[in-house]
Amino acid sequence: MVTSSGEVANLSTKNIIKNHYRNTLKFKTIRGKLKVMFDDGKRQESFTLSLRMKKDEAIWLSATLSLVKVYITPQKVSFYNKLDNTYFEGDFSLISKFLGTELDFEKVQNLLIGNALFDLKNERFNSVIQNKNYALTPKRDFELFKRLFLLDPFHFKVKQQRLEQSGKNRLLTIDYPAYQEITGQAFPKNVEIKAEEVNKKTTIQIEYRKITFNENVRFPFKIPSGYKEIKI
C-alpha cells in the first residue's frame, strides 16, 4: 500500500500476505501470445508462442506452425518437437531439473501469473520494506534452502522471488519488471527467470502480448507417431 505522499505504508505481515491473495488473478481461462528469449551461455534463441490456460487444469503452449507443442496438466508434462522428432511424457522432474527447484502444476501456474510459488498462508514470515517493496522471509526456512519474496506495494503481486540452495550452489530468481492492467486486474507484462548453478546460467525472458481472459479455449495435442522419446 502506498500513502498519498508516495511512501510505502507500514503494514503487518499478516495484512501484506492477505492483500497478496486478495489480489490473486481471478480467471477461468487465459489466451495470449508470449515472446520468449532464451540464453544458456551456449546458445541464444528468440521465438513466439501461443498460450492457452485453464485455471488449475491445463497449460498449453504452441510455437509457430505447431513445430513445438507443450501440454501441462496437474498429472503430467507432455511436449513434442517436430524439428528433431522427439517427445517427452512424464512428471514434473524435467522442468524441475531445468530450473533447479521442485515444481508442480500449481507452482508453474503461479510463476506465470505473478503469484508466490509457495503458499504464504502456510508459514510464518518476517516482513520489512526493501527498495520500496514488501520483503518477506520465512521465520524458519528449510535447511539449505532460503527464500525471499518481494511484493509490489501497489497491487501486492510478486515483484521478485528468490529460491537459493546454498549447499548445491543453486539460485533461482524470478523477476516481474512490469505489470499491465487487463479488465481491472494486474497481470505480468514481463517475466525474467534466471537459473544459476556452478559454471552454468540460464536466462529466460518472457513478454506477454494480447492477453485475454475467460474465452473458450481448446488444447489440441497429439504426439506424432515415430518420434523418439526423451528419457531423463
Provide a role label for each language-model segment.
Residues 22-30, 42-45, 52, 70, ...:
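Edge/loop elements at the starts and ends of beta-strands within beta-rich repeat scaffolds
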